[in-house]
Amino acid sequence: MLGSSLRGRIRGRERVRHFAAQRRAELISTRYARWRTQPVRPRTVLYEAFSGNGMLDNPEAIFRYLLSQPDMADLEHIWVLDEVEAHPEVTGEFTDHPKVRFVQIGSSAYLKALATTTYLINNATFPQEFAKRPEQVYVNTWHGVPLKHMGFDMPGGGPIARNITRNFLNADYLVSADPFMTDTMYRKAYRLQGIFRGAVIEEGQPRTDRQVQSMKDPAAARALLESRGLSLGDRKIILYAPTWRGESFQDPNVNAAQLLRVVRDLQAALDPERYVVVLKVHQVIYDAVVERAGDCDFLVPNSVPTNTTLGVTDLLITDYSSIFFDFLATGRPVLHYVTDLDEYSIDRGLYLNQEDLFGPISTSMPALVEHTREALASTEPSARSLAGAEVFAAKDDGAATERLVNVVFRGADESGYTVHRDFGTAKETLLVYLGGMKSNGIMTSALNLLRNLDYDRYDVTAFYVFSRGRDRAKNIGQVDPRARVIPRANMYNASPRRVREEVNRLMVHGLPETLGENHVKFWSDEWQRIFGHARFDHLIDFSGYGCFSPFLFTAAPSGTKSIWLHNDMMSDMQRETIGEKHLEDRLQAVFTTYQHFDHLVSVSPELNRVNAKGLASYAGQEKFTYAINTIDGDRVLRMAGVTPDEIAAKAAGDVPEHGRSVERATFDAGNIASAMTSLLEHFDVAEVIREARSRSRLARLAPGGRSTTTFVTVGRLSPEKNHARLIRAFAQVHEQNPDVRLVILGGGKLEEELNGLV
């Protein structure tokens, strides 16, 4: 066990790291916010690929095409790199180019470019601070057709994919290779159907143009690979390109030794005069593999576009990497080498079944060697690859970049291209704010509401403050899986000083009837950062006590707005704890937002009357209404460990068959010492004492016999709980069946009144 002093030092270091990270985030937000006040520079383009891992993928293809076009000669190009000096091939090529420059990710120059560049092109995501400005055009190209489950299709995927979803909602254009990618990934996996207001350009992936070019001029492609350190000669190229593992580019799992072993073992089994096995790893693990591989002549460098290599590859070996979708257009064979397919399919999930993949599956090195030899022996194009290309690569024809540029940069008529803007549905869209996800009665009611909504009628988005805390994470995991989730990172597009000024002003003065320009700008920027272009028919602040969501909702561009009143709000504001009114300032500010809501929703008729009277000076009577909190009956039974059939059997006087294996103990009912001995054979002394004390306390508070049925309710004795109705109803039950009792656990201002009613 750790000593107290060691634990203290560990906690101290964690606090220092947390504080340092917070200060860095504040500095970034401050700089980015400052640059957002500057004009957007016309005819500028910012490119970022894989968080700055190089000049790569679709952004690289778009960049080179634009650079080659006479009608785009006035464009200024800005490339984002993780470390500018770490990419000498790229920077050296454009050192003297007057229209190309490089910025380091996270730097002040990067934040300036992100805030003031007209065209933003990324194949992954911009950071949490980013929010697209109205003058900007954001093109997210993504980086491949999905094979692995993505977004909400992964276990716990909604919170994990929070920044991807946010980026997509901010985008003006998303790039798609084919209908499968559009429907499977954009519409369903990231749940853009219903709220996305941009366009999906389904005209192929720009990066595949490099593949077509490489196939037309293989000598140039092979020469490029040779110049970057690969030893090819005139041998046929076998490319091993496995996927990366992990949940984010920032935290990949790397097993470099295993990857290198596969290449060396396969090369050893083939004729070295005729075949060469080369390795292409994902950009995010490249440095780690280079460190382990040392000076080798078979690792494809990041500086060579992947599709350039694919164009001269004779046989592709991969696992779950979507790289094979690009390769299908070559008509050459694909092999899948996977040692954990069943486990991976269960844990992560795949969109295609094993039998739907486009090549043989090998689970061992001997099997891979055999399949490799068979594929290399064939002189005919791969029928499976050609069939797959018709579905997944029909538009990877060498002109995908031109078509995208025509739509985005040249303003071509979209009717001549496959451009989807049909993301609306007949469902009404609901945005429900859940608050900070801390366990309490309001949280339980919110989760119950999400489970009881009609998802055939409503498209539901649950919005909350993201947290990794154990209690809050548990509640996040209980959000109905049918709801889309948008977790908010706790930051603003403003400096900490500007945030304090805005919040302090609102806390002191509240919201006026007419909202000022500065208020609207501040909160509209935050709305854009979180939700992008999304619009909702109905906005619900179910939390009811915080200031953030009411202030944010005033800047919402559309939708009716409702806020829940979970208690006698005026009394809550005056409630004292240890001599202080902790809620007074906050609720006074919240009350001033009521004039900007359409509905003020109490949770019972009686509470509605109380709030309508107490808050009359803040809103008109027509805004006050009520909606009784819902119950998730299935969850109650599940947590109680019983089924509806068991409940029905007990009500009918039958003894239900639990279907459980229960060990039964026998004892002498007339001898307590003997009975206790038998009991202690099955339970610890502490458990027996705890149960005895609990029953003794219950017997004192609510006497009853062994045959008495006990009902228990737990909650604050306040109007919204409506204990009076429960007591009156239970009186009728007791009149018909005296052998029942009701135990009410709680305290509050209605205690004396309820005691009188009892």
Q: Residue ranges of each PLM-predicted region?
A:
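Short N-terminal targeting/anchoring amphipathic segment
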Residues: 46-47, 112-126, 508-520, 527-546
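N-terminal pre-catalytic "stem/leader" segment of glycosyltransferase-like enzymes
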Residues: 2-113, 423-518, 522
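Active-site proximal beta-strand in glycosyltransferases
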Residues: 133-150, 335, 538-540, 553-573, ...
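Membrane-proximal helix-turn-helix segments that form the acceptor-binding/catalytic region
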Residues: 109-111, 159-174, 527-534, 569, ...
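C-terminal amphipathic helix plus adjacent low-complexity
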Residues: 365-440
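A short, active-site helix/loop in glycosyltransferases that binds the activated sugar's phosphate group
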Residues: 173-197, 587, 593-626, 631-680, ...
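Catalytic binding pocket for nucleotide-activated donors in carbohydrate/polymer assembly enzymes
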Residues: 163, 288-296, 322-392
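Conserved catalytic-core segment of nucleotide-activated headgroup transferases in glycan assembly
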Residues: 56-64, 68, 76, 205-289, ...
